[in-house]
Amino acid sequence: MSVRARRLALLLLAVAGCREGGVSSRTAVAGGNAERGRRMGVAYGCGGCHVVPGVPGAVGRVGPALGELAGRAYVAGTLPNDAPTLVRWIQDPQALRPGTAMPDLDVGPRDARDIAAYLYADHAGGLGPPHLLPRRWLGSH
């Protein structure tokens, strides 16, 4: 086994160990219901601006794609990516980042928790996006 293959295997084992149940304590949404959150995302029209995994027709290109959100360091580019911040962001984005393009959709607390739970859910399975792995470990394909 090459050095690159050994490093990749160790990294994959380490990452797999960090994803107990697919949700970290940072992204666990207390009281959130992911399936209801998917439905609420449709009801609030999130797919008009965002690509949302598991939501047919959610192919908007105004805001960022929302897949693999749990693996990102920030929400809205500057806010720490944790459950309380994401819930507040969904409820009142203008309060957290005045002037943002994200509109205030008058999302209530329960709906915001459920939407956050859905966005943090592991939709694709696996170990996350390959762009998080060092390119030198992936080869030069």
Residue ranges and their predicted role:
Residues R19-V42, H131-H141:
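Electrostatic cytochrome c docking/interface patches
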Residues G37, A43-P53, L86, M102, ...:
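The canonical Cys-X-X-Cys-His
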